[in-house]
C-alpha cells in the first residue's frame, strides 16, 4: 500500500513541476519569469531521474540499482543548479545590486558540491557509498542553502508573495539533512523526503502566484 501512495504522490509532484514550469516559461515575458520557469523545470525534470526508477522498482521485477544511483547523481547536480537559479530569482525579484562576495560564494559552493558528487567514492552505480561521503558532499550544498535562506529572510517584508519563501527553503533542508545523515542506518528517516517534496511544491506555487499577480497587473 505504501508503494501505491508514494507513486501517486511522486507522479503528482512531477506533473505539477513540469506543467507549471512550462507555463512559467511560456508566460515569462521578463527575466524573472523565465528564471522561475527554468528553475521549476530543472527541479521537476531533475527529480524525475531518480523518482521514475524508484517507482519502476516498486512494480517491475528487475535490478534498478544502477538507474537509481545515476538518478540520484543527476538529481544532486540539478538540485545544486536549482539553488543557483534561486539566487538569480532573488536578485531579479528584489532588484538588488550584485554582491560579488555572495555571487562568488554561491558559484564556488556549487562547483565544489558538483565536483564532490562526481567523485568515484560516492559509488552511485552500486548504491553502497558511505555515510561519510554523503555528508561531505552535502556540506557545501547546505552552506549554499543557508545563504539563499538568509537572502530571502532579510527581504521577506519587501514582497508579500515571497514572504514565506525562506521558510519553505529552510524546512526543505531540515527535512533533507536527517535523510543524508541517518537514512542508511534508520530507513524510516527516508520518509522525511515526503515533506521535503511538499516544500518544493509550495515554492513552485509561490512562483505560479508571482506570475499570476504580474499578469493581473
Which residues make up each language-model segment?
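Alpha-helical transmembrane segments in multipass membrane proteins, preferentially the mid-helix core
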Residues: 17-26, 84-90, 115-120, 139-163, ...
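Non-cytosolic membrane-interface motifs at loop->transmembrane helix junctions
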Residues: 3-6, 62-74, 126-138, 186-196
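Hydrophobic transmembrane alpha-helical segments in integral membrane proteins
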Residues: 1-18
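A generic, lipid-embedded transmembrane alpha helix
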Residues: 39-56
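Aromatic-anchored segments of alpha-helical transmembrane domains
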Residues: 44-48, 109-119, 170-181
Amino acid at each position: 500500500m505504501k508503494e501505491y501512495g508514494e507513486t501517486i504522490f511522486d507522479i503528482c509532484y512531477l506533473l505539477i513541476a513540469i506543467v507549471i514550469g512550462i507555463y512559467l516559461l511560456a508566460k515569462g515575458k521578463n527575466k524573472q519569469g523565465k528564471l522561475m520557469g527554468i528553475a521549476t523545470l530543472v527541479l521537476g525534470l531533475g527529480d524525475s531521474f531518480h523518482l521514475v526508477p524508484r517507482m519502476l522498482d516498486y512494480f517491475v521485477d528487475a535490478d534498478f540499482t544502477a538507474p537509481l544511483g545515476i538518478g540520484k547523481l543527476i538529481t544532486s547536480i540539478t538540485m545544486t543548479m536549482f539553488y543557483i537559479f534561486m539566487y538569480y530569482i532573488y536578485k531579479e525579484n528584489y532588484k538588488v545590486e550584485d554582491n560579488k562576495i555572495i555571487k562568488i560564494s554561491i558559484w564556488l559552493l556549487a562547483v565544489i558540491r558538483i565536483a564532490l558528487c562526481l567523485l568515484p567514492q560516492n559509488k552511485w552505480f552500486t548504491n553502497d557509498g558511505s555515510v561519510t561521503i554523503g555528508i561531505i558532499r552535502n556540506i557545501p550544498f547546505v552552506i549554499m542553502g543557508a545563504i539563499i535562506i538568509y537572502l530571502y529572510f532579510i527581504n521577506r517584508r519587501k514582497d508579500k508573495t515571497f514572504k514565506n519563501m525562506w521558510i519553505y527553503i529552510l524546512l526543505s533542508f531540515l527535512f533533507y539533512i536527517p535523510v543524508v545523515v541517518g537514512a542508511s542506518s534508520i530507513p524510516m528517516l527516508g520518509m522525511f523526503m515526503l515533506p521535503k517534496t511538499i516544500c518544493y511544491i509550495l515554492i513552485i506555487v509561490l512562483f505560479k502566484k508571482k506570475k499570476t499577480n504580474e499578469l493581473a497587473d
